[in-house]
């Protein structure tokens, strides 16, 4: 399971150190793709396979299904860690997520997310006040 928040940097070649606690969960290969909210989603191959199966079931006759699967799959890239525990973030994905030097890597249960430091800080500050309301609307059990 992916848990926690980590601050990292991306070098000029687009390489980023993956938190040590996440490396064993990622395995090799793994998949990185465009996520929602201008972040990147990173999935272990087993989780990607499950997600792919679910998305393949969407009716291609529906415009939204076609748009989402195009967005999601066209940005996907299979990756492996190098010997230093780094992954290479492809340039188009760095541009999509507005990744420059500083980034934030967060664990979200079955996936890892990579955020621009600025976008993450903005997201957290905007979401803090509404977190209780979101929980009330979505969760039917005590936290």
Curated annotation (Swiss-Prot):
Subcellular location: Cytoplasm, Nucleoid
Pfam families: MraZ
Superkingdom to which the source organism belongs: Bacteria
GO CC annotations on file: cytoplasm; nucleoid
All copies of domain SpoVT-AbrB, residue ranges: 5-47, 76-119
Main subcellular location of this protein, as a coarse class: cytoplasm
GO BP annotations listed: negative regulation of DNA-templated transcription initiation
InterPro entries on file: MraZ, MraZ_C, MraZ_dom, MraZ_N, MraZ_sf, SpoVT-AbrB_dom, SpoVT-AbrB_sf
Gene Ontology MF terms: DNA-binding transcription factor activity; transcription cis-regulatory region binding
Keywords for the protein's UniProt record, in alphabetical order: Cytoplasm, DNA-binding, Repeat, Transcription, Transcription regulation
Similarity remark: Belongs to the MraZ family.
Quaternary structure (record): Forms oligomers.
Protein name: Transcriptional regulator MraZ
Lineage: Bacteria, Bacillati, Bacillota, Bacilli, Bacillales
